[in-house]
């Protein structure tokens, strides 16, 4: 089936060097705030791309739970496919796509686990059903729906309303080494600004051809 006639003109914004923030995390924070103001559904949803030990890539949507100058934090099962990938190869890439604003942000970097205290704090902020779910799900392993629901009942009976954080579950932080901000423009002459480390604890910005 051909879908070659599906196209639209991007005309909702511009991205100029003189208007961009000096640091990529400040530019990201600005765009994130604007995505929230525009009521973009789940603006913290991102594609996380990882690569396993054999070089096979995989990608999935996950939600960031924090971002700051240190990087971008998300939580998951350590034994999931992405967890196994990151154990073998800690390099990963993130992609945020805010269609309503005709914007995307690409981020590359190295992923590290956050501290146990940070994982505990976030885990205990979650709804109890989600905390039970972290125990019930042997993420990425084959299972029937009936068996999954049976595991949920078992862990509800075991922990009640106070499940502890499972040892196989916690947080990761992607420490960025590369940012690219993309703003759709007419005639496919999009704006692309790239930030890279300058070797002096700062960042250098330049424009890429669309």
Swiss-Prot record:
PROSITE patterns named among the record's database cross-references: PYRIDOX_OXIDASE
Binding-site positions, FMN: 60-65, 75-76, 81-82, 104, 139-140, 182, 192
Single Gene Ontology MF annotation: pyridoxamine phosphate oxidase activity
Annotated metabolic or biological route of this protein: Cofactor metabolism; pyridoxal 5'-phosphate salvage; pyridoxal 5'-phosphate from pyridoxamine 5'-phosphate: step 1/1; Cofactor metabolism; pyridoxal 5'-phosphate salvage; pyridoxal 5'-phosphate from pyridoxine 5'-phosphate: step 1/1
Superkingdom in the source lineage: Bacteria
Record-listed substrate binding positions: 7-10, 65, 122, 126, 130, 188-190
InterPro entries associated with the record: Pyridox_Oxase, Pyridox_Oxase_CS, Pyridox_Oxase_N, Pyridoxamine_oxidase_dimer_C, Split_barrel_FMN-bd
Cofactor binding notes: Binds 1 FMN per subunit.
Cofactor(s) listed in the protein's UniProt record: FMN
Reaction it catalyzes: pyridoxamine 5'-phosphate + O2 + H2O = pyridoxal 5'-phosphate + H2O2 + NH4(+); pyridoxine 5'-phosphate + O2 = pyridoxal 5'-phosphate + H2O2
Gene Ontology biological process terms from the UniProt entry: pyridoxine biosynthetic process
UniProt enzyme class: oxidoreductase
EC number of this enzyme: 1.4.3.5
UniProt keywords, alphabetically: Flavoprotein, FMN, Oxidoreductase, Pyridoxine biosynthesis
Function summary: Catalyzes the oxidation of either pyridoxine 5'-phosphate (PNP) or pyridoxamine 5'-phosphate (PMP) into pyridoxal 5'-phosphate (PLP).
Similarity section: Belongs to the pyridoxamine 5'-phosphate oxidase family.
Subunit structure: Homodimer.
Name listed for the protein in its UniProt record: Pyridoxine/pyridoxamine 5'-phosphate oxidase
Organism: Bordetella avium (strain 197N)
